Amino acid sequence: MSRPDRAINSEAGDWGYSEDAGERAWLLQSPSVDSVQPPSQSDDSRGGTSSLGAVFIVVNAALGAGLLNFPAAFNMAGGITAGVTLQMCMMAFIITGLVILAYCSQVSNESTYQEVVRAVCGKALGVICELAIAVYTFGTCIAFLIIIGDQLDKLIGAINNESEKEISLHWYTDRKFTITLTSVLIILPLSIPKEIGFQKYASTLSVIGTWYVTIIVIVKYIWPSKDVSPGIIPVRPASWTDVFNAMPTICFGFQCHVSSVPVFNSMKKPEIRPWWGVVTISMIICLFVYTGTGVCGFLSFGSSVSQDVLMSYPSDDVAVAIARAFIIICVVTSYPILHFCGRAVLEGLWLRFKGEEVETDVAKERRRRILQTLVWFCLTLILALFIPDIGRVISLIGGLAACFIFVFPGLCLIQAKLSEHDVRSNSWNAMVAYGVIMVTIGAFIFGQTTTNAIYKDIINNPNSP
């Protein structure tokens, strides 16, 4: 509900519901969020999601491809203790960030993440936020294509009942071929349409696939295969700075903040108190899933664990092959949805630059949409063909995820409190201080992870001096 007694921006245009195409991207990671109807100004037509339904949607929005990288993140952090401790320390900020966004959504009467940032923090930060969302979705699309290349050759080997050495002899199991063929024949046709109508199916597959992978990793740790032997299992980080290596994966895994704003507004009672319960339960569920996968996957393979944990299992394992099939289906159906969100944001920025609200020329919109899709698709495909594993991508976009979790919510909280005309009490000072802490932590994570990722790419490049 709008709070007219609290001024956020003096510009009247920042308060109304935006019709920008870029601000109609109701979903970032999870297909299910897009199925939530945008809220109307009438209370009677404001969504009807129950608290239990909201928990399901938030969990679905958080769980995703980052799950496969958690065992490797625990290894990079220096062991289970360091990885779990880091997760627990970040959990408080992750949950409060979700609550802050809901509070600012109420104050500004806006219904999507980028709209809230734009209304509360101003147009400049709104544009930066939209660009960050576009880059984030672009990077996630690259990660999806890499996962296809990682899993499809081993899935083919399982179907043909062939060993690892035999798989590599076939031209049709070459990683670049499988990524290109799958992308051109399936993903590209699904990405071109203006609207996406298969979200609910992708949502169901995503949930089933994620939980199945977690169960398989845990079961395979309890009853390991004879062909699997773990490497060295570190019990502590070699250096205290190694702990920060897990931050991109944790941020990428728990980032559901962009999707959370429309979920909050879709609830039967979009109020802060029930929302606290929703996000707390959701993040606890995610914590158990990620920790279970990370701990069991790490203990199964130790320091030899792959960036994609499923790559560490033998290709002839039927149960793991089913997990690979689930993951491939999930990413194939999720790529078009992520692309839709990124394309919608870019379209909104373009229309705003032109000073228009909507594109009235249907033919012009169609040509631009096809061009945007082809450029996006070709760039993500080319990069996926030459990036060796998802760890490289997550290490970069994990820093952006930290901005969505820490920086933008912190800035929104600071600006919202500074705009209040009430007496500035101790609680007011504490809230502003907390916002400053969130921005500082987020900026540190973004800077540290991005710099570290670039540095590692440089030193691992054989052509570097």
Swiss-Prot record:
Belongs to the amino acid/polyamine transporter 2 family. This is Sodium-coupled neutral amino acid transporter 7. InterPro entries: AA_transpt_TM (IPR013057). Symporter that selectively cotransports sodium ions and amino acids, such as L-glutamine and L-asparagine from the lysosome into the cytoplasm and may participates in mTORC1 activation. The transport activity requires an acidic lysosomal lumen. Pfam families: Aa_trans. It is a multi-pass membrane protein. The gene is slc38a7. One of its GO terms (cellular component) is axon.
